[in-house]
Amino acid sequence: MNTELTINQENKTKVHFVDSALINPTNPITVNLIGAGGTGSQVLTALARMNHALTELNHAGLFVRLWDDDVITEANLGRQLFAESELELYKSVALINRVNRFFGTNWKAETQKFEKNGLGKLKSNMKSEIYISCVDSVKSRFDIAEILNELKIDKGYYRNQCKYWIDFGNSQFTGQVLLSTIGNIKQPNSEKYETVENLPFITEEFGELLKISEAEDNTPSCSLAEALEKQDLFINSSLAQMGSSLLWSLFSNGLTENRGFFLNLKNFHSKPINL
């Protein structure tokens, strides 16, 4: 009998049940979107569409704070969602203004990096329930992980408890999206599934690979043509749509068997990352 029970447990599908506070919240779910470049600008639009869909389903929706200290240059036009009239504006301000006008939201722009202040302290507006990083440097990912690890320690009973981190990353033709939990998310008892309460950070699970990739050239592109030599025209938008679909599935299904995916746009191959 014990052997049979063990076999049944091994055959169970691994799933992660979404924190119940995100499924039926009293207030909009707070999201810190870090990076307003090629991927971040596309993810912001997807979040705005998602917010509209959620509110139509009698959900409280989303409140997004976009972090980026970069300004719009000629090289950003075309590959990123910016117009000539927006040149020299902060990326975060231009994008948030556009979304707020179009969707009637009251989302906020931060014209600074998502980092600790000059005294090494966390900023008050860093707290949110979901973090989405669309950054182009390995150091930024490790800095974000350090901040989230500090926030993870403070798990009192208050609004905006940090719960999930979704990281987007890409090279010229390939990319990946990875969902992580910030600490353990309590799981219900299930006879059908093997529940997983902790999904490691990308810096923990793929830290060595990230450090190897850091050796590649990350100098800024001075033109769109130069930018396209480093990143394909549609890698950012493809990654953004698929990654946003992962987040949407958390809200619509309440659970997930996959925590992300690898994408190769050159051969149109994608591979899910199972729990």
Residue ranges and their predicted role:
Residues 2-39, 43, 137-139, 143-275:
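Glycine-rich phosphate/adenylate-binding loop
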Residues 30-34, 62-71, 111, 130-133, ...:
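Extended hydrophobic secondary-structure segments that form protein cores and membrane-embedded regions
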Residues 53-59, 254-257:
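Phosphate-handling active-site elements
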Residues 55-61, 156-161:
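Short helix-terminating capping/connector loops at secondary-structure junctions
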Residues 60-105:
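Glycine-rich phosphate-binding loop and adjoining beta1-alpha1-beta2 segment
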Residues 87-128, 135-142:
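A structured beta-alpha segment of the ubiquitous adenosine-cofactor-binding alpha/beta core
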